[in-house]
């Protein structure tokens, strides 16, 4: 008779258990839908889970179809360690059971610790992990292989730096300031390098020539005083983050004060050459004209002499003829 209350209690709990099992079965993806096994996702190690409790969550999605002609890529910027949830969805008119799903990191295939599920004509795959160091940065790609392969890629990188795109021009003896910024990010440390080749040399802060200043955490400034022509080279600013480093270079061109005068001097030289050419041409023309006038004058004199001689010769016969008639 004492067993009755226990039996009644067990019978009372049975509907609740059945209801709970039904709910779990409904929420669990079935193999008939072409999904993965019951638990395709392997949880990260306990230590990483504990560390990840205080990390922010980064969730990103990529959508693909059987008609996608090009791989789809998405760039993601990370400054600090984070929990990451990547989801790819693939829509096809074919059989979802015939689609092979894989994940790769930088070309190397990942373990089967990702989730695959299907809804209607769409196949979903989800990869969850935690990025805690620079080795886990890189490219994560999901692949759907049917008749042809479709790929979606998530590119993880640290924030980019922004300097001056065009070369910075200054003059010998002046001072200049090089600036690097990181928008909406705060690096742990800044470093400046100079390079006129493939070798980068750290800028000596102890020298009076260089002054490094960082008024704000997201920017750094390098002041160079008493510029020389050999100071014209590439300068690199490097920002250190928890997940890696980022660099930006600024080109510095140092000119002497004679350089701006060169175009003016060239113009002056061209003007002088043009004026000299014009003067020589005029002098040559005048000289030629003078010779021409002298030649004409000489011809006129010769013509006059010729006319005079002809006149004298004509007068002599007439004089003789008159003498003969007089006799």
Swiss-Prot record:
Glycans are attached at residues 54, 61, 75, 85, 100, 189, 196, 213, 218. PANTHER family: BASIGIN RELATED, EMBIGIN. Plays a role in the outgrowth of motoneurons and in the formation of neuromuscular junctions. Following muscle denervation, promotes nerve terminal sprouting and the formation of additional acetylcholine receptor clusters at synaptic sites without affecting terminal Schwann cell number or morphology. Delays the retraction of terminal sprouts following re-innervation of denervated endplates. May play a role in targeting the monocarboxylate transporters SLC16A1, SLC16A6 and SLC16A7 to the cell membrane. It is a single-pass type I membrane protein. Interacts with SLC16A1, SLC16A6 and SLC16A7. Residues 287-327 are annotated as: Disordered. This is Embigin. Residues 71-158, 159-253 form the Ig-like V-type domain. GO terms for molecular function: cell-cell adhesion mediator activity. Keywords: Cell membrane, Disulfide bond, Glycoprotein, Immunoglobulin domain, Membrane, Phosphoprotein, Repeat, Signal, Synapse, Transmembrane, Transmembrane helix. The keyword Cell membrane applies. It is found in: Cell membrane; Synapse.
């Amino acid at each position: 008779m004492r067993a009755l209350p226990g039996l009644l209690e067990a019978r009372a709990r049975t509907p609740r258990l059945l209801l709970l099992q039904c709910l779990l079965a409904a929420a669990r993806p079935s193999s008939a839908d072409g999904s993965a096994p019951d638990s395709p996702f392997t949880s990260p190690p306990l230590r990483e889970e504990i560390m990840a409790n205080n990390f922010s969550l980064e969730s990103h999605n990529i959508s693909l179809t059987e008609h996608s002609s090009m791989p789809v890529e998405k760039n993601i910027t990370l400054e600090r360690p984070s929990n990451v949830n990547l989801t790819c969805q693939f829509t096809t008119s074919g059989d979802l059971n015939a689609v092979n799903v894989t994940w790769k990191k930088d070309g190397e295939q990942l373990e089967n610790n990702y989730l695959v599920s299907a809804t209607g004509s769409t196949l979903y795959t989800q990869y969850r992990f935690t990025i805690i160091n620079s080795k886990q940065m890189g490219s994560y790609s999901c692949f759907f292989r049917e008749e042809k392969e479709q790929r979606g890629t998530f590119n993880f990188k640290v924030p980019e730096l922004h300097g001056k795109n065009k070369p910075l021009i200054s003059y010998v003896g002046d001072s200049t300031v090089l600036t690097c910024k990181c928008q909406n990010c705060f690096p742990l440390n800044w470093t400046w390098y100079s390079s006129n080749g493939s070798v980068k040399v750290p800028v000596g802060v102890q020298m009076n020539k260089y002054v490094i200043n960082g008024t704000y955490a997201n920017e750094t400034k390098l002041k160079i005083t008493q510029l020389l022509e050999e100071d014209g080279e590439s300068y690199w600013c490097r920002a250190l983050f928890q997940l890696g480093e980022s660099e930006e270079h600024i080109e510095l061109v140092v000119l002497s004060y004679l350089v701006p005068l060169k175009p003016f001097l060239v113009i002056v030289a061209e003007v002088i050459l043009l004026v000299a050419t014009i003067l020589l041409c005029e002098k040559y023309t005048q000289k030629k004209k003078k010779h021409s006038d002298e030649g004409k004058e000489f011809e006129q004199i010769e013509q006059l002499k010729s006319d005079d001689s002809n006149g004298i010769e004509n007068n002599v016969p007439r004089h003789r003829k008159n003498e003969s008639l007089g006799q």
